[in-house]
Amino acid sequence: MFLNRFARFYGIPVIDVGLAMQRRDDQSFDLFARVSTLVVGHACLLCGGFIDPRRAREETLRRTDPNAYQKLKEEAYVLGEGDPSPAVVTFTTEAASMAVNEWLTGITGFAGPSGMLPTRIRRFHARDERVLGLPPKPDCPCCENPSTLGRGDVTPFIDMVS
């Protein structure tokens, strides 16, 4: 949520990288890398469905109030942690290279006038790549609010209340 708002309020392009491993069955996994560019006209991470506001709230609570987080976890109000978090150097390095390529495209224009792609997803297990051109959602509180574009410094910082 922070990166979305930071890019929007300050008009600074942000490149977000994610790596996810999803359990297919007891012995195999699907492995994905995602690179999203947060610039005007591209869908934000919320619009693209790449972040879950509930999980973001839980992660904030875990950092800021571990006791309250633990209580919610004990009451089964915290989302599960069923999929592993990958840290395989070849895959993380490739995901980082995808992000650097988008940055180079953004500053040099070598890929043409369309600029950076909104979202690229590499499916390592299938050995392919997909480009998602998701439009911003009309009711998005982050990327479709005209009052936040280039707003800069405000109190509270980027209108975030914890």
Kindly label every feature range from the protein language model.
Residues 1-41:
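Rossmann-fold NAD(P)-binding glycine/threonine-rich loop
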Residues 18-19, 48, 92, 144:
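Active-site proximal loops enriched in glycine and acidic residues that flank catalytic Cys/His/Asp
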Residues 22, 52-54, 148-150:
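Short, acidic Gly/Pro/Ser/Thr-rich loop/turn segments
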Residues 26-118:
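Adenosine-phosphate binding glycine-rich loop
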Residues 105-162:
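Phosphate-binding loop/pocket of nucleotide- and phosphate-handling active sites
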